[in-house]
Amino acid sequence: MLARAGEVGRAGPAIRWLGGIGAVIPLLALVLVLVVLVIEAMGAIRLNGLHFFTATEWNPGNTYGETVVTDGVAHPVGAYYGALPLIVGTLATSAIALIIAVPVSVGAALVIVERLPKRLAEAVGIVLELLAGIPSVVVGLWGAMTFGPFIAHHIAPVIAHNAPDVPVLNYLRGDPGNGEGMLVSGLVLAVMVVPIIATTTHDLFRQVPVLPREGAIALGMSNWECVRRVTLPWVSSGIVGAVVLGLGRALGETMAVAMVSGAVLGAMPANIYATMTTIAATIVSQLDSAMTDSTNFAVKTLAEVGLVLMVITLLTNVAARGMVRRVSRTALPVGRGI
């Protein structure tokens, strides 16, 4: 036993060294990706300027014609790019997905943990994990062939015809479309995000200690009061983390959105049913044509778009970590306030 303890003691520095390397590698990878994107996008950043974030036009110019040099950057004649519709489409579809997915996921996790028999709860939990692993292209195909047309023919017309004509809500009015657009994209993203949030939240609820819950019930609380006063405060910061995981999936999803969004560039969506596109879907759909640009300016612009998406994701995660800390400080410790 002493010999083994000595061996472990001698291996301690090596384990710490390997652990330090493992901790640094993700940070180095993130910095490397950022540096590569910035270097690749530098010409586009310099030429596109701030109007890149306010303009709506997406025009690669005459990629087979003459080229011009502006501010030291070569580009095709007529090339002009604006990313505002892409940013709006990305944020709007992610917001729609979370508005639907968060209550559904948390509610489903609560029902599984609180109401279902143990064996059935385990079976449903396994199904949720399997749903989280479905390839996005399969979900996108289902959305394009079945879900999108169903929404366009049966759900969207009801919403469009009954939505009040008042600011903000009038965005729900208009032509329901043919099964492609912002609403369908957001709903498809919600289908993909629900298993992620629900699985994580389900695991969190299962980790809540039994004694505080039993104490709350012994004091006369109903099951709902126990959930509200004990279970949710215990896992509140974890739920925020689960939502961030889902948001990251929604922001970066590519194939499913490309198949149901309509992939329309250069136009702001007029209503929630309008065809549009997102940053990730644009990078995929435009990469082939960008490679035909002999000046490489189109590729540089796509790199700038990718950099914008990465910055949005990083800012979202930083904000979420702040929310987790705030929720952790303000949430009642289990047992207080019961």
UniProtKB/Swiss-Prot annotation:
GO terms for molecular function: phosphate transmembrane transporter activity. Its main location: membrane. One of its GO terms (biological process) is phosphate ion transmembrane transport. Coiled coil: none annotated. CDD domains: TM_PBP2. Disulfide bonds: none annotated. The chain crosses the membrane at residues 19-39, 93-113, 123-143, 144-164, 181-201, 232-252, 254-274, 295-315. This is Phosphate transport system permease protein PstC 1.
